[in-house]
Design a protein with these regions (language model features):
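Sec-dependent N-terminal signal peptides
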Residues: 4-13
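Residues that define the transmembrane beta-barrel architecture of outer-membrane proteins
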Residues: 24-28, 62-70, 83-85, 108-116, ...
Length: 237
């Protein structure tokens, strides 16, 4: 008797779940973000660091760089036709610039990365808010240094492959977080074009490289803001 009641209750639960979340299903899509990056630099010297060393690695102020990318999302959405929650895997390519400046110098650390993360999103009607977190794995770095002396600009550009990154960074793995907002324009029940905006940050870059003496901490980070466009395919909102 108890087993029969349990089976009946389970059947009703399945029916209720299907009816309540009739718009649930798998989703796929891609996203193209384009925006600005504001770099931040922080260094802490050891007590025995000479002044000439401190002057060479002095603190820099924030400057503006350029970010872009192409990411692909896949995951599952649970919804009732009006609101829902989706959990997406977010994988792709990102171009990230950390820009900083001093009195007579500007520096740009430009990374080409593979991006791996997750993107939970909360949907209501045509609107969606997301919070992404993950890592970026660099496969190339271009470091550009612009110096100014007597109103004359000099520029030096150095390219580093993935095997050479440890000469610049103790740990070149980038951690990122990202808040996004987008609006869906539906072309059909299962296809929508997305327009939105984002704000986020990249951090955890230890820029000590091979020169680990005299420096206890030398970190790069950035604040990223921009717009994004994408395409969404699948069932649900």
């Amino acid at each position: 008797m108890k087993r029969t009641i349990f089976i009946i209750a389970l059947i009703f639960s399945i029916i209720f779940t299907k009816e309540s979340f009739g718009s649930s299903g798998w989703q796929f899509g891609f996203n193209i973000p384009i925006g600005a990056s504001f770099g931040f630099y922080k260094v802490r010297f050891s007590s025995d660091a000479p002044q000439t060393y401190k002057d060479n690695y002095a603190e820099r102020k924030s400057s503006v760089g350029f970010d872009a990318g192409l990411t692909f999302q896949t995951g599952y959405l649970i919804g009732d036709g009006e609101k829902g929650i989706s959990l997406l895997v977010d994988v792709g390519y990102s171009h990230d610039t950390f820009a900083i400046r001093g009195t007579d110098i500007k520096e740009y650390y430009t990374f080409e990365n593979m991006q791996l993360g997750i993107l939970p999103k909360f949907h209501k009607g045509n609107y969606a808010v997301g919070f992404g977190i993950g890592i970026k794995i660099p496969f190339q770095l271009i470091h550009t240094s612009e110096t100014y002396a007597n109103n004359v600009k000099s520029e030096t550009t150095t390219k580093y492959s993935v095997d050479q990154l440890d000469s610049v960074f103790k740990d070149a793995l980038i951690t990122y977080v990202k808040f996004s907002f987008d609006y869906s324009f539906y072309l059909s029940d299962k296809i929508a074009v997305l327009f939105g905006a984002y704000i986020g940050g990249d951090f955890n870059l230890d820029a000590r490289g091979a020169e680990k003496i005299y420096v206890e901490n030398r970190n790069l980070s950035s604040l990223d803001v921009g717009l994004q466009i994408g395409l969404k395919l699948g069932n649900g909102i």
